[in-house]
């Protein structure tokens, strides 16, 4: 039966996978290198979302009829899949769904207990989702804001005193050069031992460094479904203790079990603290399918996803590093291959590449403070790889870049 956004059946055996396992719908003459912004969606994820809209499109967590109960089961499965992917215990953590990573971070930072923290700690290298939300937190609460430097290996440079009664918000993987943040376990345990709270931005790490996250026990992890092969969605996996401590100012249906003229009673389930109103049920269900697809990639395709991505990243790095008139900022093997183009504007170069079917990101990637104020760099070009990319994509990119850069 042919059904779904792309009207193509999902592959079922390794023999049918080809080079673009899960992405057979993609045109051969187009190469997408912007997975750091949002990944493309494998066919099973599209099928799962379409199946919801076509066969049981109902509200969840508030109805008794069959379609709604099926939604309940699928959403519960997605919550469990989030915690399982991160290696978090459902006895201590709960998964809430929201708009995106930025929204999830702001929901937390705007509702944390007043007077709880002495300072907020982050780094100079953060995405605006962290950099601006921590800035606003400090301005609103009047606490000190500490901006940490990173070493050449990405390690955070801090004193133990910085962590005392601190709200620490940092990324697990940088979105400019793909560097994973080392020493997160020590940062988390050190902060928590000194009465602080740690929130991780895992938007990049979920798809490109999940092994780096597993085993960590922060107070909250925020990420986006659309960066890990799911639909557009935000996720907050937080301790029940943190969620129950929030001073809620964003309220609505789905959070309460009783309401009177001047009071309300909250549901006992901690995940509801961040879920005011109806949720994007189809997107949540698609996230569950995406996490299952990632988890089952090796068995279904015969390849290890991380190894495959690293090999392609090395091919791309090696092809670009040999070219003149560009300065690479990322390390070999990183899923992000970012460079400063010399003698040509980054946006113009991205336009030229697009005409040849090569789609890349140009600009500052929401890291304006670090790249502009601190490093005084011009706009950059970023290739970011995903599960859909192939050696043919890399060859097309390098073959297109070569005459452009040599002709400058």
Model segments located where?
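Pyridoxal 5′-phosphate
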Residues: 1-408
């Amino acid at each position: 039966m042919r059904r779904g956004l792309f009207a193509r059946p999902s592959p079922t055996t390794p023999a049918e996978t080809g080079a673009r396992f899960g992405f057979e719908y993609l045109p051969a003459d187009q190469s997408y290198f912007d997975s750091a912004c949002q990944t493309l969606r494998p066919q099973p994820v599209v099928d799962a979302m379409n199946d919801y809209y076509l066969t049981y499109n109902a509200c969840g967590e508030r109805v008794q009829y069959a379609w709604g109960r099926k939604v309940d089961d699928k959403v519960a499965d997605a919550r469990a899949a989030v915690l399982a992917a991160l290696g978090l215990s459902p006895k201590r953590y709960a998964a809430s769904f929201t708009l995106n990573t930025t929204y999830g971070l702001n929901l937390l930072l705007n509702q944390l207990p007043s007077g709880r923290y002495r300072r907020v700690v982050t780094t100079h290298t953060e995405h605006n989702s962290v950099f601006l939300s921590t800035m606003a937190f400090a301005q609103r609460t009047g606490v000190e804001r500490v901006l940490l430097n990173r070493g050449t290996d990405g390690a955070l440079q801090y004193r133990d005193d910085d962590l005392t009664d601190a709200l620490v918000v940092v990324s697990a993987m940088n979105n400019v050069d793909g560097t994973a943040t080392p020493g997160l376990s020590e940062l988390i345990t050190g902060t928590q031992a000194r009465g602080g709270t740690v929130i991780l931005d895992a938007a990049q790490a979920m798809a490109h460094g999940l092994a780096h996250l597993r085993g960590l026990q922060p107070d909250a992890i925020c990420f986006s479904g659309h960066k890990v092969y799911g639909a557009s969605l935000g996720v907050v996996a937080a301790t029940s203790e943190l969620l129950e401590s929030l001073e809620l100012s964003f309220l609505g249906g789905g959070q309460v079990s009783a309401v009177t003229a001047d009071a309300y009673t909250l549901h006992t389930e901690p995940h509801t603290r961040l879920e005011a109103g109806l949720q994007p049920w189809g997107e949540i269900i698609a996230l569950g399918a995406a996490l299952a697809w990632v988890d089952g990639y090796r068995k279904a395709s015969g390849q290890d996803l991380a190894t495959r991505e690293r090999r392609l990243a090395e091919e791309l790095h090696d092809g670009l590093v040999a070219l003149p008139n560009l300065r690479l900022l990322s390390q070999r093997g990183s899923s992000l291959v970012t460079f400063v183009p010399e003698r040509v504007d980054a946006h113009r170069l991205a336009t030229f590449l697009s005409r040849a079917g090569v789609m890349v990101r140009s600009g500052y990637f929401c890291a304006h403070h670090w790249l502009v104020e601190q490093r005084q760099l011009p706009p950059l070009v970023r290739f970011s790889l995903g599960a859909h990319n192939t050696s043919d994509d890399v060859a097309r990119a390098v073959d297109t870049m070569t005459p452009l850069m040599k002709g400058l």
